[in-house]
Amino acid sequence: MTLPKLSSVSVSSGHVSANSHGFSILSKHPHPNNLVHSHSLSHTNAKSHLPISSTSTKENSTNKEEAESLKKNNPSSWDPSDDIKLRHLKEIKNLGWKEIAHHFPNRTPNACQFRWRRLKSGNLKSNKTAVIDINKLFGVYATGDATPSAGTPSAEEAVKEEAVEDEDITAGSSAIEDSPPDFKPLVKPKYMDRKLITQRSTSTFSDHEPQHTKPRKLFVKPRSFSHSITTNTPNVKTAQQTNLSLYNTTSAKTNKAVNSNDYENIGLVPKIIIRSRRNSFIPSTQIPHSTTKTRKNSHSVISSRRSSFNMMHSRRSSFNSHAPTEPISRRASLVVSPYMSPRRLSTSQSVHYHPQHQYYLNPIASPNCKTDHANDKITHTRTFLDMQKFANKHPWSREDDEVLLNNTKDKQNHLSPLEISIVLPNNRSELEIQQRMDYLKRKGRVSGFHTNEGCKDEEEEDDIDPLHKENGINTPSQQSQNYGMLEAKHDNPKSSELSSMTSANDIRNEQDELPGINSIFKNIF
């Protein structure tokens, strides 16, 4: 029985040792639950140490990928190498923005264009790539890009493309022009205000430039390219010559052998030919921009224009001096108031019985007769304006009179005044034609008066109204007395001439033209 006790004791001792060991542990860890929890945590931490480090590396890699994708989608920073590449493609190869965008991955043509504009405008002061001369770096950049990448062509292909583009430009475009011997621009750039000239043209400029002159600035803003294309020539004459060679293409092609002095005097103002109304030919001189001599020439051209317009005053004065003479002569042939019989005068007393009218409208008044011209101008302004309508510019010719006479003789093919006005060349009115016909009839009757006097008396008695026959049949002596009384009333100096007209036939002959005259005054008043 002792053995099991020993065993129990040993077990108990073992248990005690375990308990002692447990107490020693409890001395360090007074709470056994915490001990178990700490063991479990240490075990789990030991197991989970490797997966935590792997997840952190994965998170870092995802962050880098997101940053790279953001950079690819929205590239904000441009490296100096990218700037030099952009300038090389644009300024030397003259590529389009879409073609340039293919050389830069994940960059749009607008972004490339905006970056190039910022480089050329000088806004990027800290960036020195905008100041670098691309022409000098062309060989270095070509050797640096000799290894072809996936998106960029090789340097040999770029040189071939450049040669092909130059051939196409020289063959198909009108950019190559004839110019004076001291200046030969080769290629006209596509955009004058945005591009530099190619390497060949700059080399030709540098050959003609003296060696001691150096450019003040390596970079020129694009606004200056609209006025002068050369980048490294401070000489002003070459810039003016480039403008002239670019704009005056037709004149340069037609005149191949032109002196350089002529090119200095050619401006952009076109040749103006001024023809005045008097057929004076005034060729205006070509006006260059910066000489005082040309300003004097331009002033002389303007003064010649002014003088040509000032000639209008002399024309007006000539018309004004000539105008009063024509209506007076016409008025003398139209208004025949002193020859009217008393019967006709009774019908038109309101028109012709004024003494001022009598002096002014008398056709037989001598030039020595003194009249009040001021009163005439005041009282007869209306008649002057009305008579001016009937003043004919063209006198009657013999051919016109023959047409009218043939019309009066030929009763079968008798034409109306309207038809005669169409036939006559000078666009005469019906009233003028009727007056001329009456005048020709009267002239023919006077010439043939002595042959057929009795027939005319009977015909004219039939033409007179019956009222005038009853009231106005007077003897020639009575008519002459009436005319003498009229002339005494109006103080006419030509009473002797009027008293000599004593025959009734002459008075009736003058009465024949009264209907035409009355119709004229009806139209006037």
UniProtKB/Swiss-Prot annotation:
Region (Disordered): 22-82, 283-308, 451-510
Alphabetical UniProt keywords: Cytoplasm, DNA-binding, Nucleus, Phosphoprotein
Residues within the DNA-binding region(s): 97-120
Molecular function GO terms recorded: DNA-binding transcription factor activity, RNA polymerase II-specific; RNA polymerase II cis-regulatory region sequence-specific DNA binding; sequence-specific DNA binding
SUPFAM superfamilies (alphabetical): Homeodomain-like
Composition skew (Low complexity), residue ranges: 299-308
GO cellular component entries: cytoplasm; nucleus; Rpd3L-Expanded complex
Top-level taxon of the source organism: Eukaryota
Biased composition regions of type Basic and acidic residues, renumbered to the chain: 61-71
Record field: compositional bias (Polar residues): 35-47, 472-483, 495-506
Biological process according to GO: regulation of DNA-templated transcription; regulation of transcription by RNA polymerase II
Modified residues (Phosphoserine): S280, S333, S341, S366
Domain HTH myb-type: 67-124
Gene3D superfamilies noted in UniProt: Homeodomain-like
Localization: Cytoplasm; Nucleus
Family the UniProt entry places it in: Belongs to the DOT6 family.
Self-association state and partner proteins as the record states: Component of the RPD3C(L) complex composed of at least ASH1, CTI6, DEP1, DOT6, PHO23, RPD3, RXT2, RXT3, SAP30, SDS3, SIN3, TOD6; UME1 and UME6.
Function, as annotated: Component of the RPD3 histone deacetylase complex RPD3C(L) responsible for the deacetylation of lysine residues on the N-terminal part of the core histones (H2A, H2B, H3 and H4). Histone deacetylation gives a tag for epigenetic repression and plays an important role in transcriptional regulation, cell cycle progression and developmental events. TOD6 binds to sequences containing the core CGATG, which resembles the PAC (Polymerase A and C) motif.
PANTHER family the record matches: MYB PROTEIN-RELATED, TRANSCRIPTIONAL REGULATORY PROTEIN TOD6
Other facts noted in the record for this chain: Present with 830 molecules/cell in log phase SD medium.
Protein name, entry field: Transcriptional regulatory protein TOD6
Organism listed in the record: Saccharomyces cerevisiae (strain ATCC 204508 / S288c)
Biological classification of the source: Eukaryota, Fungi, Dikarya, Ascomycota, Saccharomycotina
